[in-house]
């Protein structure tokens, strides 16, 4: 019956095409010779799923398979013979998942299990990796965390009151990411960690804000006074140096990526540095916060620059057609004077050397973000960046490190530009004493302060930008750069 219906549908489609004189193949400039040259075969690989099957056909197929899954006895029936063959062929053709990981190493098997959403198998494989003392490479680690796409839900509980309600699948994902962190050697050694009846145990917020009135920066953005009061030197000395169309971005986006540059007159930093203090986090290894890195007026000048040129939404293209705005951004390559002044302020508080790799400076490519309620940066691990720059003819250079002395970042440098909002903590996750549980350590943003923590090859830290509940949060993401090759003898 299924074959008959399919045949009738195809015949009807063919008849409709022959009855419609407007659908005529263009032959004026064919992309391929027809017929193709002797001895050659041409294979077309569709780029879009909808060129092969319609969205409706795909939905019907998924619904049919899900329905039959509930009744395994029916799948064995004679009527399902052709379906079983088709499903087998589909599975054999699939280039992802466990089917293609047979005989591969444990890292590849975990990747395949996650692709197939076989989370129990993934946890078993991760346990084996831990027993064998194997650790995933950074690329695999970042991919696993990205694929799991864990949502903490912490922004839904104001003032740390109450527990987050999670679905069974969300609880499972947290258990898997806990296993991932344990394989990498992460653990919470805090004997006084708060225990909660939840898969994510929220710990006390680390709050270094001074006991002084908070500047209402976002209110001045909304009423237009912040940009209106910005000096003309800002408006005259900021320019676009590169635009990447949305579809060409990685991953593709609904909006273009616009890269700005500025002269030293645009956003000048004071030559008299503020009184910066630096404190390591009491629990999270490698995490520290420096306060008074920027003056409040310097923070507001950066926000004014972003608002003047307009923050651009970050909305990745999705196959399902949904639009999810992560944040609004302002990409800015700071001038050399700005870099040198800021580096002189923060350099005393970063490790001079990591395994013989010397610290060299800050990545001049600043990603300035504006977060509002509904936009949050889910749990992730930061990747490493080279130091970016600008050529003499005003061209952007992704990797501007010296050819003979390549550099790459080892620390994230997260600068907070305001604090007049609710929520919006930067939250760090560690495996708790009990397996399957994560302890969450929130850090409250301080205007003009900066969080510094490891990424890349050195003890990369799982963290999130917890959602803002009220107001708007402005923050800069950049990196601390180090030599790729060690130049000092590493003492053992």
Give the residues covered by each predicted segment:
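Fe(II)/2-oxoglutarate oxygenase catalytic core
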Residues: 2-450, 456-492
């Amino acid at each position: 019956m299924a074959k008959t219906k399919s045949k009738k549908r195809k015949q009807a489609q063919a008849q409709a095409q022959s009855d419609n004189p407007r659908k005529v193949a263009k032959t004026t400039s064919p992309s391929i010779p027809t017929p193709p040259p002797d001895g050659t075969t041409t294979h077309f690989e569709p780029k879009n799923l909808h060129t092969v099957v319609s969205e409706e056909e795909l939905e019907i197929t998924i619904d049919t398979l899900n329905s039959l899954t509930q009744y395994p006895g029916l799948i064995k029936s004679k009527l399902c013979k052709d379906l079983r063959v088709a499903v087998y062929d589909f599975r054999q053709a699939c280039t992802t998942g466990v089917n293609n990981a047979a005989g591969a190493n444990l890292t590849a098997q975990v990747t395949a299990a996650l692709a197939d959403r076989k989370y129990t198998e993934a946890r078993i494989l991760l346990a084996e990796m831990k027993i064998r003392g194997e650790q995933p490479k950074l690329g695999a680690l970042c991919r696993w965390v990205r694929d799991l796409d864990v949502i903490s839900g912490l922004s839904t509980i104001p003032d740390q009151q109450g527990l987050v309600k999670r679905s069974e699948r969300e609880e499972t994902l947290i258990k898997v990411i806990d296993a991932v962190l344990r394989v990498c050697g992460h653990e919470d050694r805090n004997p006084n960690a708060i225990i909660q009846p939840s898969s994510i145990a929220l710990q006390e917020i680390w709050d270094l804000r001074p006991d002084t009135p908070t500047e209402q920066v976002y209110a001045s953005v909304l009423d237009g006074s912040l940009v209106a009061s910005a000096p003309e030197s800002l408006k005259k000395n900021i320019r676009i140096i590169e635009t990447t169309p949305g579809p060409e971005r990685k991953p593709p986006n609904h909006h273009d990526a616009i890269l700005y540059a500025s002269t030293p007159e645009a956003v000048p930093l004071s030559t008299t540095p503020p009184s910066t203090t630096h404190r390591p986090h009491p629990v999270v290894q490698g995490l520290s916060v420096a306060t008074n890195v920027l003056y409040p007026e310097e923070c507001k000048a950066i926000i004014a620059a972003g608002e003047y040129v307009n923050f651009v939404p970050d909305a990745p293209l999705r196959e399902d057609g949904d639009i999810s705005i992560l944040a609004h951004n302002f990409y800015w390559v700071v001038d050399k004077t700005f870099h040198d002044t800021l580096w002189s302020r923060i350099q005393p508080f970063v490790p001079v050397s990591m395994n013989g790799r010397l610290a060299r400076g800050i990545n001049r490519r600043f990603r300035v973000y504006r977060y509002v309620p509904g936009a949050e940066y889910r749990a992730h691990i930061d990747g490493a960046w080279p130091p970016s720059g600008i050529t003499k003819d005003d061209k952007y250079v992704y990797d501007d490190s010296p050819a003979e002395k390549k550099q790459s970042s080892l620390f994230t440098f997260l600068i907070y530009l305001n604090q007049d909002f609710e929520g919006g903590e930067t939250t760090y996750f560690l495996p708790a004493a009990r397996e399957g549980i994560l302890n969450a350590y929130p850090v409250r943003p301080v205007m003009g302060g900066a969080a510094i923590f490891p990424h890349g090859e050195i003890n990369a830290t799982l963290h999130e930008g917890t959602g803002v509940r009220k107001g708007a949060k402005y923050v800069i993401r950049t990196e601390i750069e180090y030599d790729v090759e060690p130049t000092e003898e590493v003492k053992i």
